[in-house]
Structures are given as C-alpha cells and as structure tokens.
Amino acid sequence: MSASAKLSRMVCLLCGFFSTGISMASSLILLSASDLAGQWTLQQDEAPAICHLELRDSEVAEASGYDLGGDTACLTRWLPSEPRAWRPTPAGIALLERGGLTLMLLGRQGEGDYRVQKGDGGQLVLRRATP
C-alpha cells in the first residue's frame, strides 16, 4: 500500500472516529430539570392508551429527584409501583419511586423523545407534548 493510500485511509478512520465521538457525546448531555419540565406523554408502541405526565422542576428531597405529576397511576401497567419523582440523567430520564430507586430509565433518542425497550419486545415512548 502506498504512503498516500495509507494516509488517506488513516484520515478516513480518524474522521469516522471523531464523528462517532461527537454524536455519542451529544447524546450524553445532562439537561437540567427546568429544560425538561413540562407536559409529556408516555405510551407503548403506537397503542391508543396514553399516560399524560407533567415533569416539574420542584425538588422531592426523599426521592432525590423532581416532582412528577399528571396521571402517574397510569404507569403502573408497566411499573411495579407508581413513580413519585423523576430525574435527568446523562443517558435520559429516570422515573423514581418515593425512596429514590429508579423504576425505569428512558434513553434519549432525540429532542423530546425518550424510549425504553420492554422485555416482551415492546417499546415505551416518552414524548414532549405539543401545545
């Protein structure tokens, strides 16, 4: 392999490495509670049943998170107990029980779009509600 071919190959590899690193780093941005506060919906796949939630930026000390409002009882169809709070994480949004234990971690897929894969192959999707 010629020197110029080796150099060209190395440049391509480095470009791929840096672009992958940049996209991975951008997906691990820790958003603040105030950035995420607002109205959200959670549903399984495209099922008609939708849970309407409100992520609030007021702290819930015993859960080490922020207040979760709306129809939280609706979430018990997928969770072992009703979540009391939430918190932003570098990977997404965690729904928490009263003591702060994470019940579900929804991974960030894009702006206002968070998802988790269920054991049965279904997917839960949390989306920012549009006004």
From Swiss-Prot:
Belongs to the protease inhibitor I38 family. Disulfide bonds join C51-C74. It comes from the Bacteria. GO terms for cellular component: periplasmic space. It is found in: Periplasm. The gene is inh. The lineage of its organism: Bacteria, Pseudomonadati, Pseudomonadota, Gammaproteobacteria, Pseudomonadales. Its main location: periplasm. Inhibitor of the alkaline protease. It forms a non-covalent bond with the protease and may prevent its autocatalytic cleavage in the periplasm. Keywords: Disulfide bond, Metalloenzyme inhibitor, Metalloprotease inhibitor, Periplasm, Protease inhibitor, Signal. SUPFAM superfamilies: beta-Barrel protease inhibitors. GO terms for molecular function: metalloendopeptidase inhibitor activity. This is Proteinase inhibitor. It comes from Pseudomonas aeruginosa (strain ATCC 15692 / DSM 22644 / CIP 104116 / JCM 14847 / LMG 12228 / 1C / PRS 101 / PAO1). Residues 1-26 form the signal peptide.
